[in-house]
């Protein structure tokens, strides 16, 4: 018998299975099996008859439910009808939600607000599918694409990247006009402004469906930090970050999904901008406040690294480190701070804001592209396209309506009116290949200039030269010689026997562990101390102890002002009551620690650390209720950054297996070098029809432009109006949909030509749905005034906080890897062709409606799981990731997470596609190291900044012990400190860290599959 397809309210489809009718009736109404099966048979018979006579092929679950209710009424079961009634979800579905919660969104906890949200969502999503154009609804149900945030389809845009200067200048109207809440004047202090920014996040959470962020956070806050101590600044930042994480008011009780971008250096684009200060008054320019910006930068990173009150990392706001040209040249200042913290704090993100190094003087090939303004319309055109527009003659063609992007000697990027368009006769061209896969084409007679140094080099003389000069700074450090008498004193404090015997001149160690026994024996021998060694049986413990007897006169308090005595004291204390993980084990704040119930000993330990320059933190641990006879103890955590490790590895510790890994330069020197850009290859090219250039006062920029990354994966390139303020601030992504690339390939039977035809059809469906949603939200914001927070105006310009015309509308995609696996006879660069096709559709849509379209690598959380389930249901032999029931697709254009290729392969893959996903993408580098080397991260970051990758993160799993509040960058089952199994494992879901227990089935499987690299 032919199949009938059942369509669920969430859009998913499955084959009609009559047995599910009786099962659902029994589950939801409690009726007996005989009645349920009788109703099942009637309905099945009716549907198959409709199939045979009327060609019925599809039926919704709502229609089946209505038929069940009709049959129950006929049987006289009125209460059962009530139980079967559908209000967005059935009674049993709602009861299941009450009992078990939902894992569609890992950022939502199991709370009453979550229940309320999902109850509402059931109604709103069903209405959205019913109200949107039918072909858009059908495409979602079939799994060809996914409409995100359908519960807010008619009501909310997606995300927002704020310019905090708006609130610094204008104050805050929490409802947009002051009728429903108090109106705040411009803040006069750092603390008040941060509170305004927090309240703006909260208000925004009621009108956006996604994330919110503040760009250039430290740079734009810097004016408010003038005259404040670092302690005051840090306290204010600490309050802001804690409050962001304590505000569970977002869409079902979620934590505020937020981010802040912090600049390693003051952006050139802000240096000469008026600085908005206390009271909204201009006070100089932002370039005057680099020192204050650096203090805020430091405070944000330190607060993030110090974690919360129970030792867990802060989940929000996501901290985005903006890296610009020159920021990574020297390992000092902000660069050193970022990498010392970022080596082991897995919550940071990195943003490549460095300008492209494709600035050249010369004559270019016809297919070289550049940014131009023609009649004030921003275009990205090749020289050949410009030639065709101008119908230019050979030589110079005067132009009056064209501006080109240029750079001056001070590295300022500005628009310049072109004087002439130059079209030359054919001549020799060369392709210049630089490090980091950069390249350009020009003629041999011209020089090239980089943004960084502005040095002119003749093309043919550059083959073996560096464009920038490399320099090395050696900072010699003194070598410690730990005093062994002080080592004995420290070790005895922890493991020696004290009391009356000691006062009578007798000292002894009573040791069990072999490494401690060897350590004590070697210490006593090295100091030429006479001792007796005996094996003593301890009946209560049923073990043999090794006891060393010697004179208590040998235990002498060391000179606490001598650096080598302090090094010896620290060695002894760490070897007794300290704990150092094999190979540098723990994460940065827990690579080494000291525990004692004697506060005198902990004071000595901290004094030694302080004088030796080892950073530490400590906390008093109270015994639990079932440990009545236990004393409180103090745990001191050593911060094992480069400097601390350099000192610790000079200490003499018990058995070398407990020593910190020798992972830093043994010569104890800092090596800092400037970023060098070398010419790798010069390739002569065949002659072309013509070569081109513009005649302008400054050097033109060819290639791509500056990019700023905002929330989630949304990137806002400066390619809309050319204005940083308009294109990147107080704007964001309006909405996006995700295309199921593997399903489109499978529906095309693997035929490449049919695939592109089908992809074109699905893109057109996406266009119709996104435009329909845009019109709905415009009505909500501007006609119904449901989101007036967004419409509050700047007091000078009158411009609203939010302008929907500047937002991006986005085509997203999922499963490019599986798509390529499902196509036949593809070319080596088929993945690029697919994304270029999506970009061509984006341009086509822009020409159609003049709106700001983009392409994004979707942050698919539940979507990747949903798509894979649909694919396996329709094509059981299809290639997806995971195992049965826990299927998922590879995220966007990523390599599968289980791939064990080295990190370079993952970076190259991201670079390959990055320029084709200017709407946003992220590179996840999954690390398996408990403690990473900061210099290795620095070196890798320098390489990534030289590439076309714009947004990346080093993601580590970490585990938190709920018993003793211990955190470790590892996935463990038993706490190494207290032995508890009451642990919570965290890992990155998409754009934030969450407990893995909150992941959906597909994401749980992905977590298990992730191959974790070591640097």
Regions found by a protein language model. Give the residues of each.
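Conserved catalytic cores of very large enzyme subunits
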Residues: 98-363, 712-805, 832-985
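Protein maturation boundaries and topogenic segments
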Residues: 364-386
């Amino acid at each position: 018998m032919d199949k009938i397809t059942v369509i669920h309210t969430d859009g998913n489809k499955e084959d009609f299975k009559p047995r599910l009718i009786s099962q659902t009736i029994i589950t939801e109404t409690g009726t007996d099996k005989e009645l349920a099966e009788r109703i099942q048979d009637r309905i099945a018979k009716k549907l198959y008859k409709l199939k045979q006579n009327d060609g019925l092929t599809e039926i919704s679950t709502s229609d089946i439910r209505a038929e069940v209710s009709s049959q129950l009424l006929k049987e006289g079961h009125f209460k059962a009808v009530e139980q079967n009634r559908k209000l967005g979800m059935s009674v049993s579905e709602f009861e299941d939600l009450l009992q078990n919660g939902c894992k569609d969104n890992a950022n939502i906890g199991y709370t009453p607000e979550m229940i309320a949200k999902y109850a509402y969502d059931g109604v709103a999503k069903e209405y959205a599918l019913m109200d949107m154009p039918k072909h858009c609804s059908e495409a979602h149900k079939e799994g060809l694409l996914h409409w995100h945030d359908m519960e807010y389809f008619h009501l909310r845009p997606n995300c927002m990247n704020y310019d905090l200067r708006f609130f610094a200048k204008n104050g805050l109207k929490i409802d947009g006009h002051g009728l429903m809440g108090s109106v705040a004047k411009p803040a006069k202090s750092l603390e008040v402004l941060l509170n305004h920014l927090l309240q703006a996040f909260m208000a925004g959470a009621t009108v956006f469906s996604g994330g919110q962020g503040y760009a250039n956070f430290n740079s734009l806050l810097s004016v408010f930090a003038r005259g404040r101590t670092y302690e005051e600044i840090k306290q204010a930042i600490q309050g802001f970050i804690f409050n962001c994480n304590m505000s569970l008011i977002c869409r079902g009780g979620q934590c505020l999904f937020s981010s802040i971008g912090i600049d390693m250096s003051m952006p050139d684009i802000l240096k000469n901008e008026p600085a908005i200060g206390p009271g909204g008054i201009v006070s100089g320019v932002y370039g005057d406040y680099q020192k204050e910006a650096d203090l805020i930068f430091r405070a944000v990173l330190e607060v993030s690294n110090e974690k919360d009150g129970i030792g867990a990392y802060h989940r929000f706001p996501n901290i985005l480190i903006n890296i610009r040209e020159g920021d990574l040249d020297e390992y000092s200042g902000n660069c050193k701070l970022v990498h010392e913290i970022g080596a082991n704090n897995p919550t940071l993100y990195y943003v490549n804001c460095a300008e492209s190094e494709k600035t050249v003087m010369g004559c270019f090939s016809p297919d070289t592209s550049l940014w131009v303004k023609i009649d004030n319309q921003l275009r990205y055109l090749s020289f050949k396209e410009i030639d065709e527009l101008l119908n230019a003659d050979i030589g110079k063609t005067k132009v009056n309506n064209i501006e080109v992007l240029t750079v001056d000697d001070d590295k300022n990027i500005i628009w310049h009116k072109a004087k002439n368009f130059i079209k030359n006769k054919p001549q020799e061209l060369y392709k210049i290949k630089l490090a980091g896969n950069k390249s350009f084409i020009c003629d041999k007679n011209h020089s090239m200039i980089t943004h960084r140094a502005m040095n002119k080099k003749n093309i043919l003389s550059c083959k073996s030269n560096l464009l920038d000069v490399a320099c090395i700074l050696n900072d010699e450090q003194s070598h410690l010689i730990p005093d062994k008498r002080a080592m004995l004193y420290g070790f005895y404090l922890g493991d020696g026997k004290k009391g009356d015997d000691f006062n009578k001149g007798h000292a002894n160690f009573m040791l069990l562990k072999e490494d401690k026994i060897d350590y004590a024996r070697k210490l006593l021998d090295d100091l030429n101390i006479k001792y007796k060694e005996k094996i003593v049986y301890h009946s209560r413990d049923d073990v043999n102890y090794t006891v060393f007897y010697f004179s208590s006169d040998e235990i002498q308090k060391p000179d606490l002002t001598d650096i080598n005595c302090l090094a010896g004291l620290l060695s002894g204390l760490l070897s007794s009551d300290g704990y150092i993980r094999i190979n540098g084990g723990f994460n940065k704040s827990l690579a080494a620690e000291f525990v004692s119930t004697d506060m005198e000993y902990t004071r000595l330990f901290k004094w030694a650390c302080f004088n030796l320059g080892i950073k530490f933190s400590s906390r008093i641990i109270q015994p639990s209720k079932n440990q009545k006879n236990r004393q409180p103890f103090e745990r001191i955590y050593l911060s094992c950054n480069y400097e601390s490790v350099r000192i610790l590895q000079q200490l003499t510790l018990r058995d070398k297996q407990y020593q910190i890994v020798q992972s830093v330069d043994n010569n104890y020197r800092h090596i800092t070098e400037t970023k060098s850009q070398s010419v790798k290859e010069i390739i002569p090219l065949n002659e072309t029809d013509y070569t081109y250039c513009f005649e302008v006062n400054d050097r033109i920029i060819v290639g791509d432009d500056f990019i700023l990354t905002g929330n989630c994966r949304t990137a806002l390139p400066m390619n809309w109006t050319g204005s940083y303020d308009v294109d990147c601030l107080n704007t964001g992504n309006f909405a996006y949909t995700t295309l199921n690339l593997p399903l489109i390939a499978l529906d095309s039977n693997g035929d490449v030509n049919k695939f592109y035809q089908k992809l074109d059809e699905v893109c057109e469906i996406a266009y119709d749905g996104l435009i329909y949603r845009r019109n709905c939200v415009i009505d909500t914001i501007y006609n119904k005034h449901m989101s007036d927070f967004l419409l509050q105006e700047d007091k000078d310009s009158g411009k609203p906080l939010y302008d929907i015309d500047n937002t991006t509308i986005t085509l997203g995609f999922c499963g490019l890897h599986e798509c390529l696996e499902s196509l036949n006879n593809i070319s080596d660069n088929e993945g690029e062709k697919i994304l270029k096709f999506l970009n061509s559709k984006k341009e086509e849509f822009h020409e159609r409606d003049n709106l700001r379209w983009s392409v994004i690598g979707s942050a698919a959380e539940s979507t990747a799981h949903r798509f894979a389930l649909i694919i396996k249901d329709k094509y059981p032999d299809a290639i997806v990731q995971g195992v049965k029931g826990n299927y998922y697709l590879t995220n966007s254009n990523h390599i599968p997470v289980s791939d064990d290729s080295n990190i370079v392969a993952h970076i190259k893959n991201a670079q390959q596609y990055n320029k084709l996903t200017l709407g946003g993408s992220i590179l996840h580098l999954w690390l398996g190291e408990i403690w990473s080397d900061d210099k290795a991260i620095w070196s890798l970051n320098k390489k990534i900044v030289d590439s076309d990758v714009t947004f990346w993160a080093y993601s580590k799993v970490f585990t938190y012990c709920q018993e003793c509040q211990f955190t470790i960058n590892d996935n463990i089952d038993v706490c190494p400190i207290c032995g508890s199994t009451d642990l919570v494992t965290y890992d990155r879901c998409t754009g934030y860290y969450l407990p893995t227990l909150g992941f959906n089935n597909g994401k749980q499987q992905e977590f298990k599959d992730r191959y974790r690299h070591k640097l």
